[in-house]
């Protein structure tokens, strides 16, 4: 199962791990299908670490899950922050997942069992390279907006349930 994130810097194709992390996958796919992420910005960009988006208020403080409440973390042992291009749920503590997500710029073992991994980049890693080079202010907000214009779902197993 995959989706393409159509950003202002180009397209990133991401494999979604539906079987391994069903809650995070269902939430992300349903939000994508409802155009929830359309025209949102990546509001946090830390070179060497990650880029974060998924907040419809574009402040870094908003967003909610499809269930209108926070949902539990999922930590299968085989999914780790072990390379560049890992897609994970952002949270503010245990079991506080909503709509925000981030993509890693490198391997970060300290994130394992803290943030739910639910996907990885399978095409368009060069777009992630461009994102990492965008200058930021003192709050890690990109000085030139990086916009998630839309998302294309290539196959949605949840739609058939």
Swiss-Prot record:
Its EC number is 5.2.1.8. It holds the Pfam family Pro_isomerase. GO terms for molecular function: peptidyl-prolyl cis-trans isomerase activity. GO terms for biological process: protein folding. Transmembrane segments: none annotated. Residues 1-153 form the PPIase cyclophilin-type domain. It comes from the Eukaryota. This is Peptidyl-prolyl cis-trans isomerase-like 3. The lineage of its organism: Eukaryota, Amoebozoa, Evosea, Eumycetozoa, Dictyostelia. The gene is ppil3.
């Amino acid at each position: 199962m995959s989706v393409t994130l159509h950003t202002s810097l180009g397209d990133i194709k991401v494999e979604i791990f539906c079987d391994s992390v069903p809650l995070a996958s269902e939430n992300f796919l349903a939000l994508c299908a409802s155009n929830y992420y359309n025209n949102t910005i990546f509001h946090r960009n830390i070179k060497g670490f990650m880029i974060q988006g998924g907040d419809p208020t574009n402040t870094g403080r908003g967003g909610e899950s499809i269930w209108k409440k926070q949902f539990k973390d999922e930590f299968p042992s085989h999914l780790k922050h072990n390379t560049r291009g890992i897609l994970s749920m952002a949270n503010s503590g245990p079991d506080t997942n909503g709509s925000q997500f981030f993509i890693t710029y490198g391997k970060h073992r300290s994130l394992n069992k803290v943030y739910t991994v639910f996907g990885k980049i399978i095409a368009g890693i060069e777009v992630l390279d461009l994102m990492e080079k965008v200058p930021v202010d003192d709050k890690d907000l990109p000085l030139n907006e990086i916009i998630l214009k839309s998302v294309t779902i290539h196959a949605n197993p949840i739609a058939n349930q």
